[in-house]
């Protein structure tokens, strides 16, 4: 076994076998009566809505995911012990995955049409009163973006509330909003956007297209981890500075805003390679290993974090999965134990995937389950045309029918697959929407 294969095996074992308090979240939620979320593909499963899933924080975070706690920033929200997804990312998932209810407000689609990955970066900057007078800076850690991916769109979303009093200059012309890059030691700020701040009643998200600025940032020889933007307001003919809070920006009453009210940088990208869930699993395993190393060893006992409880949880999941496979294998006339004559012909069979049973519900937000299907049955002669056999499969099946010892029968395998969309929390605690190819079997064939 070469070193790369050995490393991959070790990472897989770490993901599957390390004691993980987060993996016990499924058992805790089952005890609390929480059900699975229906998949965007309409597969079987429970009837919870995504809004209910995002708000199902009845279980204390510390009891559900103590091992993941070091990865969470102070003051961040939790979803079953994880980061609370921004409302926009939830709306984006519903819209792009085809789950938006009738009459729902459409989300902006800057570059989303050509993207297969959309990442939401939450503002990490801290504001003070003096900074609010001159402008508001936004700081985003974009180091998790893959260098090989193409950025097809990026937008800054900032919450603005209506002001009860008209702003300065309202009788003549509205103030101007100026968005620029932050000044640095070796670079001058670059003006990105200039537009009028129209009077506002209620509240809304001001959206700024920053795709070109993001591309320039990534083209730098050694791009910094942080992507910094500065929003200012000016008024009058001489463009006098204006405090943003007078236009409804900023954090009411001082202090930090709620997670869902912080500014959001939404980056749409297109990967240059076929994405694999295994790659994200390895990243999750590395982050989890770092979190576990920072935790004190658990006390022996019967608690949810004890080795005995973790082992029991894994045993329950293995039993449940084995039971599911047995039930599926015995249905539909498969008849594995009655020889080849008793088996059904090659066809698509149900295969329900529950991410909670896999222990992935501590990082996958939606869907929590979906219908994947699988292919099962015999490929005997003559092969049916709907199985779309290859010429090689036809010859192999013919030889097998004449002399079974001369060649094995052709195999019943997926002939056509379709993607599903997954909303998840990556290893850097960003909420990511990604479309994964080849996740659902649409048709089976003999190969």
Curated annotation (Swiss-Prot):
Transmembrane segments: none annotated. GO terms for cellular component: extracellular space. Residues 1-19 form the signal peptide. Residues 337-346 have a biased composition (Basic residues). InterPro entries: Cystine-knot_cytokine, TGF-b_C, TGF-b_propeptide, TGF-beta-rel, TGFb_CS. Belongs to the TGF-beta family. PANTHER family: GROWTH_DIFFERENTIATION FACTOR 7 (PTHR11848:SF160), TGF-BETA FAMILY (PTHR11848). This is Growth/differentiation factor 7. It comes from Chlorocebus aethiops. The lineage of its organism: Eukaryota, Metazoa, Chordata, Craniata, Vertebrata. The gene is GDF7.
């Amino acid at each position: 076994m070469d070193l790369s294969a050995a490393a991959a095996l070790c990472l897989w074992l770490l993901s599957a076998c390390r004691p993980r308090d987060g993996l016990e979240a499924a058992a805790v939620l089952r005890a609390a009566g929480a059900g699975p979320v229906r998949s965007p593909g309409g597969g079987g499963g429970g009837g919870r809505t995504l809004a209910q899933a995002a708000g199902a924080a009845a279980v204390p975070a510390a009891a559900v995911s103590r091992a993941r706690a070091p990865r969470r920033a102070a003051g961040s929200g939790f979803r079953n012990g994880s980061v609370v997804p921004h409302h926009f990312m939830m709306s984006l998932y519903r819209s792009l995955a085809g789950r938006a209810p009738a009459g729902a407000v459409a989300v902006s689609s800057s570059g989303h049409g050509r993207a297969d990955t959309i990442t939401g970066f939450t503002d990490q900057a801290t504001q003070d009163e003096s900074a609010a007078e001159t402008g508001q800076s936004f700081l985003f850690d974009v180091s998790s973006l893959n260098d090989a991916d193409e950025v097809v769109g990026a937008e800054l979303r900032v919450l603005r509330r209506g002001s009860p009093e008209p702003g300065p200059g309202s009788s003549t012309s509205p103030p101007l909003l100026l968005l620029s890059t932050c000044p640095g030691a070796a670079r001058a700020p670059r003006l990105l956007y200039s537009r009028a701040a129209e009077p506002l009643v209620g509240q809304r998200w001001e959206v700024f297209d920053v795709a070109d600025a993001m591309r320039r940032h990534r083209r730098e020889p050694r791009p910094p981890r942080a992507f910094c933007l500065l929003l200012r307001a000016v008024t009058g003919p001489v463009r006098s500075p204006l405090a943003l809070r007078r236009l409804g920006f900023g954090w009411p009453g001082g202090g930090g805003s709620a997670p869902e009210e912080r500014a959001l940088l939404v980056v749409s990208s297109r990967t240059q390679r076929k994405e694999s869930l295994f790659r994200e699993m390895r990243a999750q395993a590395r982050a989890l290993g770092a979190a576990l190393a920072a935790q004190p060893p658990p006390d022996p006992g019967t608690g949810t974090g004890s080795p005995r409880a973790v082992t029991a949880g894994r045993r329950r999941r293995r039993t449940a999965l084995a039971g599911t496979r047995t039930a599926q294998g015995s249905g539909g006339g498969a008849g594995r134990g009655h020889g080849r004559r008793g088996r059904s012909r090659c066809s698509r069979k149900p295969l329900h995937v529950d991410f909670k049973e896999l222990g992935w519900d501590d990082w996958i937000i939606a869907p929590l389950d979906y219908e994947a299907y699988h292919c099962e049955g015999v490929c005997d002669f003559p092969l049916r045309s709907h199985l779309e056999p290859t010429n090689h499969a036809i010859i192999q099946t013919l030889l097998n029918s004449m002399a079974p010892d001369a060649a094995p029968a052709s195999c019943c395998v997926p002939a056509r697959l379709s993607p599903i969309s997954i909303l998840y929390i990556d290893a850097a605690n960003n909420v990511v929407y990604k479309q994964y190819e080849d996740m659902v079997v649409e048709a089976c064939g003999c190969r």
